[in-house]
């Protein structure tokens, strides 16, 4: 039986139903490229994840071969597809008030400081972390203009768009108190029931921007009283981790805090930081 579809449509259908081959050589090239561009180290067991995420890019571009896709990337170092490639391979697991023990430490530190208290969320993902920081500072310091500011960044431009929107499912805010939910969020009605949006009064204190932590210099409005860089260093090798931590040093004020993820340990990487608490590091006053 012959197909009644035009040949072009038949080709597209075949792409959608057939599993494309990802050779060892192509997987190694992908690992090299994402390491060069974003510093991310992909282990062999991530191969299925890489396939499932990048095959969507191939199909969106009408390509049926990973080699052609990689050659297209390498042929134009300024192609917009590079950002799509990075977005596809970054992992964004986050939640409001994740690793909750950090936030009372942040609040206490903020109350003891003078002037505008500034925080950088260096892996902001879809916004849950920077908004959790903002809620903590609003509760601790109030909402007077110029009292505090949160700068939030990520390499993934797609998650930053969601973060800027400030829209979340109500079910994602279970870690907030009823008072915080009422004070800092608006509930959706009608077709938007079950959704909430960050109130503009809080959102005004949070600034979002795209930053690649591999850059030699960060275009960020430091220095900061605290930096949150949680659950992102685990994707980098030790050399890259050390380089990033050294770039953080001049961006922190004396006795500034660095918050790390639960599985990250920076104690033996950079001598300027000393352990202050559970996954919390302080910049030595004489090293700033």
Curated annotation (Swiss-Prot):
InterPro entries per UniProt: Bact_Chemotaxis_MeTrfase, Chemotaxis_MeTrfase_CheR, CheR_C, CheR_MeTrfase, CheR_N, CheR_N_sf, SAM-dependent_MTases_sf
Molecular function GO terms recorded: protein methyltransferase activity; protein-glutamate O-methyltransferase activity
Binding site for S-adenosyl-L-methionine: 92, 94, 98, 129, 154, 212-213, 230-231
GO cellular component: methyl accepting chemotaxis protein complex
Catalytic activity from the UniProt record: L-glutamyl-[protein] + S-adenosyl-L-methionine = [protein]-L-glutamate 5-O-methyl ester + S-adenosyl-L-homocysteine
Superkingdom of this protein's organism: Bacteria
Source organism (scientific name): Salmonella typhimurium (strain LT2 / SGSC1412 / ATCC 700720)
Biological processes per GO annotation: chemotaxis; methylation
Coiled coil: none
Pfam families: CheR, CheR_N
Task performed by this protein: Methylation of the membrane-bound methyl-accepting chemotaxis proteins (MCP) to form gamma-glutamyl methyl ester residues in MCP.
UniProt EC number: 2.1.1.80
Domain CheR-type methyltransferase, chain residue ranges per copy: 15-286
Keyword field: Chemotaxis, Methyltransferase, S-adenosyl-L-methionine, Transferase
The protein's name: Chemotaxis protein methyltransferase
């Amino acid at each position: 039986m012959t197909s009644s579809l035009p040949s072009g449509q038949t080709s597209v259908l075949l792409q959608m139903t057939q599993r494309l081959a990802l050779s060892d050589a192509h997987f190694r090239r992908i690992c090299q490229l994402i390491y060069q561009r974003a510093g991310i180290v992909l282990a062999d067991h991530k191969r299925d994840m890489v396939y499932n995420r990048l095959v969507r890019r191939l199909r969106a571009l009408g390509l049926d071969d990973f080699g052609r896709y990689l050659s297209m990337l390498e042929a134009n170092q300024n192609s917009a597809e590079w950002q799509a490639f990075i977005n596809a391979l970054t992992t964004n697991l986050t939640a409001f008030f994740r690793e909750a023990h950090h936030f009372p430490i942040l609040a206490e530190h903020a109350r003891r400081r003078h002037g505008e208290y500034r925080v950088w969320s260096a892996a902001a993902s879809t916004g849950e972390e920077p908004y959790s920081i903002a809620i903590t500072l609003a509760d601790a310091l109030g909402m007077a203009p110029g009292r505090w500011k949160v700068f939030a960044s990520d390499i993934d431009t797609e998650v930053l768009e969601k973060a800027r929107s400030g829209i979340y499912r109500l079910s994602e805010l279970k870690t907030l108190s009823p008072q915080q939910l009422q004070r800092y969020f608006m509930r959706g009605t009608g077709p938007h029931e079950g959704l909430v949006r960050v109130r503009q009064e809080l959102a005004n204190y949070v600034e979002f921007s795209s930053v690649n932590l591999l850059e030699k210099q960060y275009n960020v409005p430091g220095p900061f009283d605290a930096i949150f860089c949680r659950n992102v260093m685990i994707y980098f090798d030790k050399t890259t981790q050390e380089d990033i931590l050294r770039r953080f040093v001049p961006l922190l004020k004396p006795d500034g805090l660095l918050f790390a993820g639960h599985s990250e340990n920076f104690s033996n990487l950079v001598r300027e930081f000393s352990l202050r608490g559970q996954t919390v590091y302080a910049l030595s006053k004489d090293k700033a």
